Amino acid sequence: MATNEQFKIKLEKGKAGEYAVIQALSQITEVKDLTNYDDFKGYQQKGLDFEFLNRKTNTWDRGDAKANIMESGLTFMELYKANGKLGWFNTTKSDWIFCYSVYTKSIYYYSINEMRGYIDNRLKDRSIKTSHLKSGDIGVWLPVDKNPLIEKFA
């Protein structure tokens, strides 16, 4: 289990990621910040940190910011929580996941629906394996700079 100190560090990293992603998106499109838990509890519980105007489709898409890129450039897709319940990768209602690296200050993004299909297919054909974290969470690690579905935010 994570200690209280580890949880605080993770929370601060997450807030830094949310801020960086929302600021970067705000430079190119309209963004609705949904990160205030008290004001947007329902959105937050669905894994939504913001909505943004997708300039390609001219629709409002939902986004979730993660600050879970390791120094090695790998990002973690949480399939199951330690308690056996589905992890954020399976439960988020977001359209897009934005990953922020606290090490490089880079932002990467991917379509959650496309990535779910990709992960499902790779698990079925055994070309990737699940990892069990010390926390008890189960998921897969993917390199942000080599995966065909993950794009770097300019």
Residue ranges and their predicted role:
Residues M1-Q27:
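Interdomain/boundary linker segments immediately adjacent to catalytic/signaling cores
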Residues N4-L11, T29-N36, A65-Y108:
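Catalytic cores of nucleic-acid endonucleases
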Residues E5, I9, T57, G84, ...:
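Non-catalytic C-terminal interaction segments of nucleic acid-processing enzymes
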Residues K8, I22-L53:
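A short acidic/basic microdomain associated with nuclease active sites
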Residues L25, F50-E71:
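Conserved catalytic cores of phosphodiester-cleaving nucleases, focusing on short active-site segments
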Residues Y43, R55-K56, N90, Y100:
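Generic structural signal for beta-strand residues in well-ordered domains
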Residues Q45-G47, N58-R62, T91-S94:
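Short connector loops at helix/strand junctions that flank enzyme active sites
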Residues E51-L53, K66, Y80, G139, ...:
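Intrinsically disordered, low-complexity regions of eukaryotic proteins
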